[in-house]
Structures are given as structure tokens and as C-alpha cells.
Amino acid sequence: MILKSFLLGNLLSLCMKIINSVVGVGLYYGFLTTFSIGPSYLFLLRARVMEEGTEKEVSATTGFITGQLMMFISIYYAPLHLALDRPHTITVLVLPYLLFHFFWNNHKHFFDYGSTTRNSMRNLSIQCVFLNNLIFQLFNHFILPSSTLARLVNIYMFRCNNKMLFVTSSFVGWLIGHIFFMKWVGLVLFWIRQNHSIRSNVLIRSNKYLVSELRNSMARIFSILLFITCVYYLGRIPSPIVTKKLKETSETEERGESAEETDVEIETTSETKGTKQEQEASTEEDPSLCSEEKEDPDKLDGNQGYQENWKLEILKDKDLFWFEKPLVTLLFDYKRWNRPLRYIKNDRFEKTVRNEMSQYFFHTCPSDGKKRISFTYPPSLSTFGEIIQRKMSLYTTDKLLSPEDPYNHWVYTNEQKRHNLSNEFINRIEALDRGTLTLDVLEKSTRLCNNENEQEFFPKIYDPFLNGPYRGTTKKVYSRSIMDDSITWTEDSIEMVWINKIHDIFPNDYREFEQKMDLFNGESLSTDIGHSLTSINKFAGESAPNLNLKGLALLAEQRRLDSENQTKCLKFLSDVVTTDPNDQTIQNKYIGIEEIGKKVPRWSYKLTDHLEEQEKENEEESTEDHGIRSRKAKRVVIYTDNDQNTNTYTSTSTNSDQAEELALIRYSQQSDFRRDLIKGSMRAQRRKTVTWEMFQANVHSPLFLDRIDKTFFFSFDISGMMNLIFRNWVGKGPEFKTSDSEEKEAKEKEKTKEEKKEENERIAIAETWDTIIFAQAIRGSMLVTQSILRKYIVLPSLIIAKNLGRMLLFQFPEWYEDWKEWNREMHVKCTYNGVQLSETEFPKDWLTDGIQIKILFPFCLKPWHRSKLRSHHRDRMKKKGKKENFCFLTVWGMETELPFGSSRKRPSFFEPICKELEKKIRKVKKKCFLVLRALGERTKWFLRVLKEKTRWILKTVLFIKRIIKEFAKVNPILLFGLRKVYEPNENRKDSITNNKINHESIIRIRSVDWTNYSLTEKKMKDLADRTTTIRNKIERITKDKRKIFLTPDIKISPNETGCDDKRSESQKHIWQISKRRSARLIRKWHYFMKSFIERIYMDIFLCTINIPRRNAHLFLESTKKIIDKDIYNDERNKEGIDETNQNAIHFISTIKKSLSNISNNKSQIYCDLSSLSQAYVFYNLLQIQVINKYYLRFVLQYRGAYLFLKDRIKDHFGTRGILDAKSRPKKPPNSGMNEWKNWLRGHYQYNLSQTRWSRLVPQKWRNRVNQRRTIQNKDSKKDSYEKDQFIHYEKQNNYVVNSLPNKKEKFKKHYRYDLLSHKYIHYEDRKDSYIYGSPLQVNVNGDREIPYNYNTPKPESFYVPRGIAISDYLGEESIIDTGKNPDRKYLEWRILNFFLRKNIDIETWIDIDTGTNINKNAKTGTNDYQIIDKKDLFYLPIHQEINPSNQKQGFFFDWMGMNEEMLYRPISNLEPWFFSEFVLLYDAYKIKPWIIPIKLLIFNLNGNENISENKNINRNQKKDLRLSSNQKEYLELENRNQEEKEQLGQGNLGSDPRNRQKDLEKDYAESDIKKRRKKRQSKSNKEAELNFFLKRYLLFQLRWDDPLNQRMINNIKVYCLLLRLINPKEIAISSIQRGEMRLDVMLIQKDLTLTELIKRGILIIEPVRLSIKWDGQWIMYQTIGISLVHKNKYQTNRICREKKYVDENSFDRSIAQHGKVLVNGDENNYALLVPENIPSPRRRRELRILICLNSENGNVVDRNSVFFNGNNVRNCVQFLDEDKHFDTDINKFIQFKLFLCPNYRLEDLACMNRYWFDTNNGSRFSMSRIHMYPRFRIS
């Protein structure tokens, strides 16, 4: 058995080895390459098929194989690769060769001069066959690339060591595959030749010569096939033969731009092809000459344009004349965008950064003291190294590059570094001991800054200190005094000489190139060298130093290298290099080095797309063509404004200066295959796309098929199927009745679906017309002819015919009416989309763009016109149904409701005539028959009456007798007794007793669903009313019956009467009692059920809690329950309500759904207990002052439960005496500030600013949660908190019910933890006077505080002073804005209203509280703000509405209460591209959030001001909540915008410190005004304005409200028409009647400003989510987003100053990274400083890693005496201000603080893995255990 398994295991491992071996993989790849069939196979087949003899077959095969072998070898042999891979050489060879080939095939006889030679090898044709196969095998990869082979090889290339073995094996594999293929081809051919069925085919037999013909013309067929394949391949790839040159921008511009380099990106969407991906790698630049050899792996794929870039760069020289330029540069534009990248435009500067470099560059470099291959090696450095190697002898380079023992050297340098770092660290700590200011001890991180006064930082991408040593620009160094102090003057000069020597390494003529911007993609060589020198120490076995730009010396780097090292290295270099003695003059030139750093290679041209081209057309007569292929679009002019006011709009010849057009852009609905590609880029390399629908709006890559919702062949509507099946099962039972509303909804849905479907069909038709060539012209001309035919030929002839017919039939002709109607019909020419122009004017380019013809008031031929009087009412009814009185003309002359819709039925002319005839005939018939029928019937009737009379008399006599008998039998009193029961009782109470219940008290206990309650009450009343009415009716009926049946004959004896009276009395009594009971039962049923269920569950629960198995789960639930009860205990004691109602039962989660209405109480604690954390439960336990429920202690003491508790929680409970029954104190101490809060207090750097947080937390989700909150019962003023039930349980998904927790669940959980942490922090003693107490506590005065709104991110918006009761504060509305999140944005732009309207100078307003009165106390604060009161701002009315008496108080709290937290640095320089005021406000808000009153940050939904402002004209349109309906007309808006812009420009910008902003804004506005004056606006200026809002770099996005869009468009259509008509009134009125035009949208007021639009909800301004690329370090510190709250709530001064004016004067020094430590009154006392935070993150990481790496002695931690000096440790206490700052014991606090100070941090490990080791796998990651310092002991 063992033997078997052993053998099997061996066999397996052997197989695995074979499979994974180089040979195995090579064979596999080789076999695969067989399938990359290219055109070269054609020749091979040709030789076989044409049967030209075995020699040719053999030569073809050998040629084929030789070619393939060459290909395989060229992969690894660089010279061959270069020779074959030069795209130009190949091109030059191929063209003549192809020509020759076709010529050869078509004129054979030229060459058949001596084929009779005996040696067949000398036969020219056989040699040609060989050559054909060989050459085409080579072409197969370069001219006609099939990338399969290259990709497959690339995959394996860097994996195997034995490359030749791999090559051979893959070749062998290919050979095997090829042999199989050829054998198969041979078999097929043989079968065809042998197959008799083919031969005996009738056709072939009839034509005897067909086969021979075929064989003769085979050569021609093959050449045609070859030609087709070549053309096909070349079509897929732009040939590199002659390329289109794009217009370059001039050099001066280029220089200007490089000064203002700002962040730009090109999104690379091209496929990753092996290792060839042009994304930006860190320091990579375009390699120079000899990088070619380095890069050969990247050259496998034949992207001809791709490689030419570097080669030809050198040849480009501006000084040459055109004929001196080599042929290549004339023919090729080597600066093409060869890769199909997406071009991302950035209008702020000219050109985009070019990143056409390989993603990886492989090269060996010493790492960890050993030589390793690095894949992120800077190519420029390797190039430089090679150049140097050529100049030096091999011996010296070896000596230079290898120290004695590289590993020891590395260890030594690391030791040194570690030593220095730890010394510095210790010094800093000692300085702390000496009592230095904490801020001075912290290591500052340096940032470059351009402008000291304005805190204008370098963008992070370009800042070398923050982002590695690349991409920095520095000032030019001219004077030596500026040089860094570390290098003396003499060293300086020596350095310069060395650098000159290094220059001499390169050929002389390079120096001219240095001045050219274009060299190496516009990157000067000196830069390259300077750059390489900084990294040259890599040769010396060290990691690359960081180029330090503060000390501007070339090679100064503070910590990494001593200058001695450098001098040695440089001296050596300069000695080895031989300088040319004649070159002295040149050397002198270079004493001042011009610049350090890298010039970012940019593209040499700026591309535009089609739209921009059109915009530019009029401004400057630019001839350049657009370079980006954007989506097909058509410019549709909808309105032309001519100055001459000509009425005929036909004259297009008017000067374009005068005519101003308004155009819309229409995109075709087809898939966009252009996808913004750059012209000339290689299409074939773009990601492949497919279309699988007839009509598909967007092209999709097959990669994303699974993401697309329902493509019909993939998805399967499972739920739908289930429903169907289910319905079939249940179908036999009773059907559920759907309510009317549901039915209506279903119908609506169906209808909309249908409409959508029809619309799609219409669009598809429109698109097909658009795609077919000349279709538009044909269609347009047909439409026009149809229109003319209809109007002037068909209709008039019909009218004439009709009237002639009438005359013949002796009727009055109706000439006048008919001609009037005919005259009314208008044929309006419309654009292709249906925008109306006018009757006479054709749309521009209508033959190409298409046209529609709209018929207004279409003429309909009627046989007669009814008189007005007769049909007035009826017609009006019809009109209501018909509504729209227009149609579009189709190509066949029919009418259709919508363009491309199905043609509608026209009312028939003869139908009414036929109807009328039918009626007449019917009348005549009736008259004839009536007479006859009447006679017959009379006689019959007379006879019948006689018979019946006699019978009836007999019957009645008998009947009366029978009745008298019956009456004698019956007891008559019953008849009346019944009536008596129903007789109304005078003293009867109302049918349902109205026991008043105290609403307040019930809500206190649990907020009952009062809306439901009132509903039931109403229902009961209705019932009562109904019963009384029914009773009355019955009485009336019985009375009537009594009258009928009472006969005087009957006598009633008195005894009987008495008996019956009793009976009726008792009946009545029973009835009333039962009635009363049932009413009471109905009323109390709700509570009865509730208490009943609660009791049952309490019993069950108390039993089950003893069962150990369920202990853990139930434990949580019970604690939760107890908490709930105890928190509400106080209230319950106040309102004495029976015990049954106390018990909350909503912890049983499974039953939640079914009992949703019952358990709807207290849902502020809204979580599923199944997913609650222990922390949350225990947090709530801590809130309880006295734990008085015995069985909880039982649970806690039960051993099973004990295991589940965390130790810390156990200890905590132990101290409180909860876990131990005996030592349980009467009242546990108030926990006050718990530990968590202390921890967080200490970590100041986790103080996350609001704006940042609001970006990090998912916005939509926050809104979603907030919308769940519902207000129930608005009439009660005080209980907003209880009523504000966060989530209805119906909506909640329970883990128990849905076992799969979905995304929302996770979100909720995340949210819950946030909430919990906030509660932890903000819970404190009452005496602490935090703005709100624990969210679950009851306030002293019984009034709830304002709810925290469950918005962790921004508590500010609800800080309200404790003293004021909520009901007063909020006025009538219980809580403003339930549906919308109050912190939906950073700032609700309602604020626009109050400053744009009054034109207030915002700057001064903001400056009120900046520098001057910083030290005033809160009182003066209020006075300051009264300045603003006087200005009558917009928000005052709201305050007055809320509560005039409290206004002042409210102000103070609003404004000062908002500085809940400090925001860090303001975002440095936001350019005000749009509405400078916004930016100022925005900045101000971020810096001092309390400036802008709360009221404006909340949408006042319930405010009277908003909704009552204007009555809605079309009620049915009012879909949107905020859409009060005076919307603004579209065109009007655009004109306003221009004026708006002017106003903003001229508006007083006040004391604006940022002058640059102001100037920019002014320029912006002025240029605009000038343009207006000149009247030389570009024709699409208005269009530009539309786009103006949508530009990428705007701070705000404007979007139209959705319901508006359609209405707007309809209006535009009508409006366009009205603008063109001479007398528009008639049509305007009719279109309003038809509902085509909305008056509310039409409403034009000249003074309707932007603010009005915003107020009415037409425009919604949203701040753009500013996408700032956070660097990792920043995110690291912002991760724990819990903000610290200061005790001194209103003391804002210090922090405020701290924040904005840190170190303002000396920005040259650094800005303290941790400068924003929260200060507590005194400057000296900071939160306890964690030693870890003293060094900057980078140094910290370095020190840790070095300590970790240097652990040879096994003693990982460097036990330095400083850390173990007890006194020093105790000194930590000096950082704490005991009485002021903390309520808890200091020792305990420090323990927690240090607990948070970890041994190592995860993010450091991650960074180490990536950056320090530069390795591919994380192998060393697992080994590193970093200890920076041990835990502190606390004595």
C-alpha cells in the first residue's frame, strides 16, 4: 500500500517537474504559436495546392521554418532583433517587395528565361518560393502583427534562467504543431483529389476544363488573397509609411508652460501587453541612444510607431534645412500618439505629460548588499552607466562598482544610519525632558512653497520632499552664497569642473542639443546627468539618495551620504575621463549650472476635439484639424439673432459677426466606436469591443458582460419565474384583490414600458437613416416634395372635388370654410430632432443632417362643417380628449404623431356620409313599420284585457279571504315588539365611549404609532355613525309597515302586553351591553394583545435564560432589554402606568416583522441585536446608575457566559461589583469619561476634519439612512425625539430572517460603530456641560435634547444649547428636514440668496472674526455678529419664524456653537474659476465653520416661506419636492448668465488678501465684457456657456432638476418657433392650450437671477467633490475619524489662531507637520506625547526598519538607557494637566495611552514591503518583526 502511494507520489511529482520545466513550457508555448496564423501560411498552402512539384513544396517548407527560427532567435539575440525590428527598414523592404511580387505573379513570362538547368536548386522560381516564405514569416510579426506569439513569449521570458533551452524547446513545439497542421492540410487536399463524389458532380463534368482552369488561375487567386489580407491588416493599423503631422505649439509657449507645470494625467486605458504598458513609472524618462539594447524585451510586439520614438528623437534638429533632414523625419511624424491612450484634456495649461515609457525597466542593482534584478530601475541611469562604461576601461568600472565586500559594506552603512537616527531620536527625547516646547521637539517635514505670504505650496506631485526625488523645479542657482553651507566654496568650484568633465564623456555636438527643448522629448541632457549623478551612488552599493532641494547643491543630501564619499566617487570619475584640451572655452561656459531636476517630457502638441474646433472657428481662423475622434455630433442651430431684424431668415449671407446663433449639440444614438481616440493611433491595440444588440447606446468591452444588468441571453429572471410557478400553485385558491391604486400603478407601468419601447424603436429608425450614406439627402428631398405636393396639389384638388360634389348633390358649397382651414395648416421645417424653425427657413446643412417637417393644424377634409351652435358642447369634450393638434410628415406623405413613429389613421371622408345615410334609411324604415305594428297590436291587446279582467276579479276575492284567516292566527304584538327594541333610547351615550388617554404619557413609555391610532379612532366613529343611521332607517320602515298592517279589528289583552314588554326590555338591555362591550374591545384590542404577548414572552424568556446552550445569545438580548427598561425608568415612574406596558419586547428579532406595529417603540436604538458588539451592550450597561434587575447578575455570574466576556470588560464589571453578588455596592460610581475617550484624547493626530470626513464616508448611504427617519404626529411639540423613529422595523433586514447579510446590513453595522464611538466620546457628567449629554439620558427638565440625527460625520449641525427646550427652539416644525441629510454638502448653497441679493461684501463679513478680535470673549462675539443683523440678510426671516423671542440667543448658539472641531490647513489655492464669491465663502466655511449660521445649512423644508411662495400652475407637474414651479426659461437663463458673470466680476471683492484670485476673476469678467462690446462673439458662445458650467475644473456643478428636462425641451421647441414668427400670438396661445408649452417654465422676468433659480429649485448647485490625491501618510493619520472635543467649548481663540496662522512669517522654515496639535489653553501643555510621533513618519519608518534589519545578535530591541530610566518615564506626567484636562486617574490614562502606542504599525510593514526592499514577492514581509521601543513601565 505504502509502496503504491510512494510510486504514485513520485509519478505525480515527476509529472509536475516535467510540466513546469523549461522544456515543457517551451513546447507548450511553441505549440500554441502554431495557431497565430498569418499571411505567411498562404505561400505554404499555395505551394501545396498548385502542385508545382515536390521541390517547390520542400523549398516553401524550409523557408517557412527558417523564417520562424529566425523569429525565435531574434527574441533573444539583440542585434538580430534590432535589425528585424526597425520599422522603417522593414517598411522600406516590404513595399518594393510586394510590388515585385504582384508583378511577378501577373507577368510570369518575363522571368521564364532558363528554367531548363539541370540543378533544380539554381532555378530562380524555387529560390523565390523559399524567399517568399522566409520574408513573409518575418513580416508576420512586424508589418502584420499577430500578437499571440509575442505575448506568450513575454510571459515566460523573465521566469526561466536557461533561455536558449526555452527557445529551442518552443521552436520544437512550434515545429510539431506545424507538422500536424501540414499533414492535416495534405490529407484534406488528398481527400478532395480522390473524392469521386466531387468529381462526378454534374457541373464539373459538364465543364471539363473547369478544374484545369482553376489550377491555372490558382496563382492569381492567391495573389488576390494575399493582397486582401495585407490591406486588411494595414487597415487595422495606421501604416507607418507616411503619417500625418499634427501642428506643434511654438517653443516660446512651451517654455512658458513649463513654468506652470501642474498636475495632469493621461489615463491609460490600453491593454496591458506583456510588460509593455505606458504608465508613469516613478523616475522613468525616455531612454537615450543605447537603451535600445536594454529594452529589447519590450520590443517583441511589432508596434512600429512605438519604437521609432527614441531612435529618431536625436535626428530632430531645428537648425537643419528640410533637405538636410534625413528621409525618415520627412516621412514620419515620430511624435505621434501611437498608443491608443485616452487623452484627458486640461485647459489650465497647454500640453499633457507624455508617459510613453515601459511600465517596468529591468536592471541589476545592489539591494540589501547583494545584486538583484530591479524592475523599477531608472532607464536614464542605466543609459548613463553604459555611456560611462564605454569611456572607461572595464577594469576601472569593476573597481568602482564593487567595494571590497558589498554585503559587509551595506551592513556597515545601515549600522551608521541607524546609529545616527537613534541618536537624533534620543536627543529629541532628552530635549523633552529638559522641558522644551513639544512643537520644537517634533521633527518637521519640509514642503516646498512658491509664495511665502500666500502659503502657496508646490503641488504634491511635484514636491520632491513629499513624493520622492523626481519632478521638482528649482530656482536657478547663480550666486554661490545660495549654495548649501555644507559644501565650501572650494568644493563648489571643484564640483563644477568635475561636472564639466562629465560633460566631456558625451560627443561635442551634444552641447548644442542641450539648449534644444526637443531633445529626448524636450528634456535637456544636463538635467539627465544631474539626475543620474544624484543616483550614481547606486554604483557604490548604496540605495539612491533623496535629492534635497532645500540645500541647492547638486549632490548635497543631509542624512544619506557624507560628502567625502561623493568627492571620492566624483574625483575618480573625473580622473578617468579624458578631457579634450581644446575644449577649455566650452568648459568655462558651464560654471553656472542652469537647473536641477527633471523636465517632464510633454507631448509637443495640444489636441482638440471636434467640439472645441467648432467653438474656435470664429474666434481665430485656426486651420488645424481636431486630433481626437470624438463621438459623432451634430450642431443644431435653433435660434439666430440677426441685428438687421430681417423678417425673412433665408439670408445666410449676413456677416457672421452680426448673426449670433444659439445651437444645441445633438449626439447620434449609435454606439461610439471612436471613443475619443487620438487620430493615427493604433486602433488594433485598443481594447476590443462588441455590440450584441440591434440598438446599443454604448460600446461595451466583453470583459464587463457580467456587470451589465439584463442582457437577454445571459440573465434569467429567477424571481419572476418563481412568482409564476407560485401563482400557478396558489391560483386555485381565492385570488387576492388588488387595490385600485395598485391596478392603476400597474397600468401606468405598462404604459410607460410601451412608450419606452416605441421610443427606442423610433430612435433606432432615426439612427439607421443617419448611418446610411446619402440617406438624409434622399429623405430630406422626399419630405420637401411630399410637403409641397400635400399643401399645393393634393389638398386643394381634394377641396375642389368635394365642393363640386356638393354642388352636384344640390348642397351649399363650403369654399370659405375649407380654404380657411387649408390656409391655417402650416408646414414648419424642423431640425432632425424636431426643434421647430419656421415655414420658410430650412435648417443648416439639412441635406446632410436631416430634416423633419411638422404640420401644425393639419387640414382634414370633412364632408360638411357643423354649425357652431349645435356642436359646441360635444366638440369641447372631443377637444379635451384629442389635445395635440399637430403631426409630422412621413416620407410617404402620411401623418405621424412623433418623428419616425407609426403613421396615424386619418379620419375618413366617407365614414360620416355613410353614417348619415344609415341613419336616414333607419328612420324611413321605422316610420313604415310603426304604423302596421300599431294596428295589429291594438286588436290583440283589446282581446287579452277582456280575458284577464274576469280572471283577476275571481282571484282577488279568494286572496282576501285567505289573508283574513292568517291574521287571526298570528300574535300581533311581536310585530311591534321588534320595533321597540330599535327605538332610540333617550339617555343613550355616544356609541363608543371616548376615554381620553394622555397622549404624552403613552409616548413617554413607547412612542405608539399615533397616526395609526387616530386612524382607528376615526374608523370607530364612522362605524358608530353608520349604525345610528341604519337604526333610523329601520325605524322609519317599521313605522310604515305598522301603518299598513295595523287593523282596528284585533284586540289585545292587557296581560299579554305586560309579558311582552318585559321580554323586549331585556332584549334591549342585552343588545346595549354587548354593543358597549364590543366597542371597548375594539378600542383596547391593540393594548390587550400587546400586554398579552409581552407577558408570554417574558415568561418564556425567564425560563430560557437558564438554558446554558442559548446563554450567550440571550445574554445580549436580555442586557439590551434591561438597558431599555432602566433608561426609561424615570419616565415610567412619573407617569404611573401598569407594569405590563413597561416591558419592551423588540429584542426577539425573528418576530419583529410580524409584530412590526406593536414593537415600533423606542427605535432610536435601532440595531439588530444579532449583530451588536459586546462593547455596545456594555456601554449601555455603564449608563445605568443602579442595576436593579437580579437576573442580569445571574447571567453575568453564570460560568458559561463568563467565557464569552472579554477580560477588560470582566475587570471593569468586577470593580463595579456587578459580577460578584456579595460585594455589590448600592450605587456604582458614575463612569464619567471612560477609557476609550482617554485614548482618543491622547491621539491628536487622528482629529479628522469635517470636510474630509464627509468625502470619505459614502454620501448616498448617509442620505439613505437619514431618509428612514420619519416624523409621526406633528401636533405634539415636545416629543420630537421619541417620535423621530429612526427606522421602521418593516424596513429592517434581520440577520435571523435573511441569513445572508447584505451590503446594507454591513453599512448599518459600520454606521453603528461610528455612532457608538461618538457616544463614548461625548458621554460625560452633566456638570461637564457638554452641549448634549448621553444620547440615551433623560434631561433634567424632562425635555428631550435635539437628536443627534445619527450623522456621525458632522455633529455640528445639531449642537444646541442645553438650556433651551427643543420645542421653543424649533418652533412649529418638530424637526426640520427629515428626508434630506443636513450635511448633504459642505455647505447648503441657500447662502447664495443672502449675499447675491443684497450684494454684500462677503470678505468683510468673513473677516469679522479673523485676527483682530481673536482674544475677545464670547460676549463680544455676539456683538460682532449683530453687525450682520443690521444688514437684513436672508436668513433673518427664518429665525423670526422660528421664535422671535429667542432670536438673539439662537444667534449666539448657532454661530459660536459650530466650531466643534478644527479643520486642518485650508486647501491651499483653490482657483476661483467660477463665482469667486463661492470660493471665498467655501474657504471661509472650511476655516471657520461657525461663521455661517446653522439655519442656512439645513434645508428649511417645513418653512412657510418656501412652498407658499407661489402657487403651481400645472398641478400635475409637481413631482419634485422642492420644485416650486416658477422655473426659468432656458434661453433666458443663458443671457442672464452673461450678465451674472459681469456682475460678479465688477462686484466689490473687498479686502481680498489673494490678489491673484481677484485679478483672475477680473480678467475673466473683463474679457467677457469686451467681447460683448465688440459683438465679435463666437457663434457658439452660448454653447460655450452651457459648457461653462460643466468644465472639469469648476468648483461647482450646476445641474438641472430632472423633471424639468423634458418640459424645458418642449418649451425650447415651441419657443424657437415663436421667435421666428412675425405674429406669434395665435400659435403661442394654441400651444399653451394644447399643453405643449408650460407657462411656469415660460415665466420670464428680467430680474430673475441665479439665486432665484436656485431658490426655486430649477438649478441645483453642488460643490464638486474635490478630488485631491491623498498621499498615504495623510490618510494614515485620518483613518480613525473620531474628533476630539474640548472641554472649554466656546474658547475658540487659540485653536483658531493656531490653525490658520501657524508660523506665518517664516514659511522658509518648515510648516510643522503636527503643528495643529490641539492646544489646551496653555501653549506648553499638550496631550501626552507618544514618543513615536517625534520623528517624521519617514524617519520613523527608516529607524524601525534599520533596527529590524540589524538584528544579527538576536537582540532585536536596542535597549537604550534612555528608555529604561525610571525618572524619564515618570516625566511623562508633566505633559498632563491633571485637574483641567482629565477626570480619570492619570496612571490609568497613561496606560491606555501607551496601549495605543504599538510595537509596530501595519502600514509601516506594508510600506516596507513595497518601497524598502524593492522585491516582487512578500517573502521578507513575514520575517520582519519591528520593535521601535519597548512599552513604558509606569511606576
UniProtKB/Swiss-Prot annotation:
Broad class of where this protein is predominantly found: plastid
Compartment(s) of residence: Plastid, Chloroplast inner membrane
One Gene Ontology cellular component annotation held by this UniProt entry: chloroplast inner membrane
Lineage: superkingdom: Eukaryota
Quaternary structure note: Part of the Tic complex.
Family: Belongs to the TIC214 family.
Entry function: Involved in protein precursor import into chloroplasts. May be part of an intermediate translocation complex acting as a protein-conducting channel at the inner envelope.
Protein name: Protein TIC 214
Lineage: Eukaryota, Viridiplantae, Streptophyta, Embryophyta, Tracheophyta
